[in-house]
Design a protein with these regions (language model features):
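A short, well-structured alpha-helical segment
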Residues: 20-23, 28-32, 40-75
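Short, functionally important structural connectors and interaction interfaces within domains
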Residues: 4-8, 12, 16, 37, ...
Length: 94
């Protein structure tokens, strides 16, 4: 399923931030890695597909972080369901 038309979207409960690669830090790369993820009915992250990357290994770091995220699951007619959502993982140098 996808959120909308009777599907309550999942709610992010725990977000893990990604760690920069040395190469990306050296090159001062900032921006978002955009992914399509499956949020399972148990609130864990299933399949991940990268839609837009930044290079320098940041997509792997973003995937590793997102796989640790925890959600309150999406619901359809009161029951938890698997749902596909798009997320952006931001990389900002500080």
């Amino acid at each position: 399923f996808r959120p909308g038309s009777g599907i309550e979207p999942p709610q992010l409960l725990r977000e893990v931030r990604p760690i920069y690669t040395d190469d990306a830090r050296r090159r001062a790369i900032e921006g978002d890695v955009v992914m399509e993820i499956v949020v399972r009915r148990d609130g864990t992250v299933g399949d991940v597909r990268v839609l837009r990357t930044l290079g320098s290994g940041l997509e792997q770091r973003a995937i590793a972080a997102v796989r640790q995220w925890k959600f309150a699951p999406a619901r359809r007619l009161g029951s938890a369901v698997d749902v596909v959502v798009e997320v952006a993982v931001g990389f900002t140098l500080r």
